[in-house]
Every structure is written in C-alpha cells, then in structure tokens.
Amino acid sequence: MFEGQPKGLYALALANTGERFGYYTMLAIFTLFLQAKFGYTAAETSTIFGCFLAAVYFIPFFGGILADKFGYGKMVTMGIVVMFIGYALLAIPTSDNSGKIMMFGALALIACGTGLFKGNLQVMVGNLYDAPEYSSKRDTAFSIFYMAINIGAMYAPTAATKVTNYMLGKAGLSYVPQIPSLAHQYLDGTITPANQATLESLQAAQNFTGDIATFCTTYIDKLSEAYNYGFGVACVSLIISMLIYVAFRSTFKHADYNSKQAKPANVVEEKLTPEQTKQRIVALLLVFAVVIFF
C-alpha cells in the first residue's frame, strides 16, 4: 500500500492532517463556547453552527474557480493563512460585545479559508498520479490520504477537551455542563427558583467561596478563556500544517498545475468524450442525492 508512492503524497497528507486536526478541534468546542461565552440557547447555537457548516461546504465551489485561475498551490497557501487568522480571532479573550463581532468575523474567515484549502489540496494529490508510472496507485494513494485526515479528526476532540479541562482546573474549577446555562439565567434575571437551587448546589460542589453572582461571572469567564486556549491549539496545528507544506513543497511542486498551466512532460492527459462526461455528471448527481437525503 505504501510502497512506491511519490513523496509528495506524504507531504500533502500530513499538511492536511494538521489542518483537519485544527478544524475538528475548533468544531469540538465551538458550540459549547457559544453557549458559555454568549449564553446562546441550543436553538440559536444550532442555527449559527448550521450556517457555518453550510458555508464551509459551499465556498469550496468558489475556491475551485479561483484555483483554476490562479493555481492550486496559491489557493492552498492562502487558505491556511486565512484560516489561521480566523482561529486566532477565536483564541483572543474578548468582552461580549466585541466578542460577537470577532466571533462572526472568525467564522467567515474560517469558512473562506477552508473553501480555498478544501478540495484544492486533493486535486494536487490527484495530479501526482497523472504520471504513467504512478497512475495505477491512485486509489491506494487516496486511501492513505483520507486515512491521514481521519487520524487528525480522531484525536482533535480529545485534545480540545484535555486543554479546556486543564485550563479550567488551573482556576480551581471543573467542567459541569449545566453551569454555563444556569449562570447566564441567573445573571439575566430569568432563572427559576428550582434552577437557582440547582445552581447553588453546583456552586457548593465547586468549593467556590463567594456569592452566587461572583461565581456565575467567574465560571463563565474562566470557561470561556479555557475555550480560547482550545482554539489556540487549532492555531498551532495550522502553523505545523503550513511548515510541512512549505518545507516539503519540492516533493509535489510538479503537481501544482491546472488546465491553463503547462503540465509536466510525463503527464498523459485523458480526454473524455461528451458521453463519458454526461455519465460522470449523472453519477455525481446521484451521489449528491444520496448524501443529501439519506
């Protein structure tokens, strides 16, 4: 499986592993961050999260158009930089008012950066196998590539949880899912007597000395800061991804070409007939239908 693969495959796979690790680290704590920091309800959080994911999966369409014009490598590099800025905005502790502006700005940047990165890196992987000596290894190459992606996605939630719990523990607190919502209800003056009694018992379990209002404010602030550190992990992951991409660029530079650029001399271009093109489009539409509805 691994024998005879071009070196560029491993460079691109590792770069993508770093990017996916950062992305899924962010996803693992993002909805919790929204509820803890801003007091959003589950419905409001779901709406924001859904719109963000819709943008993440739609913007690659435009990323592909830009790559056809400017080149895949440039778009991948720009995508990493834009995503890094987005994660950095999430990692900066802020007040509620400026925090919301920065949060929505960060989501826009992450979605745009992912749109430039996602897909274009895969195209370069495919281009590595246009050369006749590697064409038979294309299927196993993408198995390796997506294996690397899944490794990054598998460890990301654990990393996010560990960092968050560690930083919260340094403040002498532990994570309890009910506290952020109850704390916001208390501070907003909307808490019921039963919920306030629950909150007071949770405060006692945290061994917090102080009035309940101070506990609510402190817990929200410290938990939000802990999530900021979690987003910082995503920033570090992207830096590693960029370093791998730049350091080993020579191993896949020859695969950074599109239809408007000169192809390497050893690349054999496959010409599709109109009937073959039609069949592939129909197959894609059927796949879309299955993915969307099932």
Where are these regions (language model features)?
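Short amphipathic helix-loop junctions that connect adjacent transmembrane helices
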Residues: 26-44, 165
